[in-house]
Amino acid sequence: SVSIFKGDVVVEASGNNIENFQGNVYINKTSYQNPKGTYNFDDFTIISSFDQNRIRTITVNSPDIVEGEIVGKYEFNQLENLVKNSLGSLYTNFKPSKVKKGQFLKFNFSIYNKIIEIFYPDISIGSNTIIKGNINSDNQEFKLNFNSPQIIASDNTFDKQGYYKIHYQI
């Protein structure tokens, strides 16, 4: 099936590749259309910056998709392997992919139901749903905390009973 993403994008940034890109991206008048329907989104911004130690902060401010930030020192082309290694470390026979040392990231996001509704129409999450955690390549640390006041999946509802909290640490 075909999906259509429309919107106005304004970029005020510097850098010559994704690894040193910093600045602001403004996304306005956005809509996403798929066979299920058309979804309009409030204007939002993505800000990428570095501190004096070259630690990157990416902040997303979208009032109806997701709000939060990722902070860390990592290479985009190694993110997939960082995540795979973190999840794979749960298994005893997992062979991790090689990644550069010194990479880490922390994330903290509030996720809104609209984005879940688009990709997973049978799932609904409550307001104030938060996902946060961190990944560290050197000590293979992986922490994940997911907290939602309510999750509805198909005909199942989880609320106020502790089923909606997931905390995992390695």
PLM features: residue spans?
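Interface amphipathic segments
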Residues: 1-170
